[in-house]
From Swiss-Prot:
PROSITE patterns: H15. Residues 11-81 form the H15 domain. It is found in: Nucleus, Nucleolus. One of its GO terms (molecular function) is double-stranded DNA binding. Keywords: Acetylation, DNA-binding, Nucleus, Phosphoprotein, Repeat. One of its GO terms (cellular component) is nucleolus. A motif (Nuclear localization signal 2 (NLS)) lies at residues 145-149. GO terms for biological process: chromosome condensation; negative regulation of DNA recombination; nucleosome assembly; regulation of DNA-templated transcription; regulation of endosperm development. The keyword Nucleus applies. Confers resistance to nickel NiSO(4) when expressed in yeast (e.g. S.cerevisiae) by counterbalancing nickel impact on cell cycle associated with an increased chromatin condensation. This is HMG-Y-related protein A. Gene3D superfamilies: Winged helix-like DNA-binding domain superfamily/Winged helix DNA-binding domain. Residues 75-193 are annotated as: Disordered.
Amino acid sequence: MATDEATKPSPIPPYPEMILAAIEGLDDKSGSNKSAISKYIEGKYGSLPPAHASLLTAHLARMKESGELVFLKNNYFRAGAPDAPPKRGRGRPPKARDPNAPAPAPKSPSSTGRGRGRPPKAKSPLEAAVKQATAGMPKPRGRPPKKAKTDGAASPSPSPAPAPAGDGSTPGKRGRGRPPKVRPAVPSETAAA
């Protein structure tokens, strides 16, 4: 039995160790892609499990998430490697500034530039004076009263009652609601008899 254990090939190291050894062994400045890492591991360790491709993919993803590897442009780098490019942030990078260009002058708050938003409408001086005069007075509660009609001569008698809406002869003020249905004047049989 001791001979069986001695003749067995040594077990393969864990995948993270093999991946890091492959990246170091390939020593590519632009990083190592997944297929290059896989070929290196197959060439060095020979007999691998049948699920090697899926295991390699899973371990690469796990190492990338944990920060052991940096993934950039479909290539993997060691996180602590000095030649690994810095990880790019999200979004569009800022424009490169010319070092010889002079620094922009700080904006003064009293500059004549336009402010944000729509400019206010021009107010007439009368409206401005009324608004300023009534600014101190509190607004009364409730609905404001109706304004009285201002005719040329004020009549002491109350206004006459509006004519019935049914006749249509005078164009007076109409009453509220739906007007009554107009029936044609038909002589009734009882009135004729």
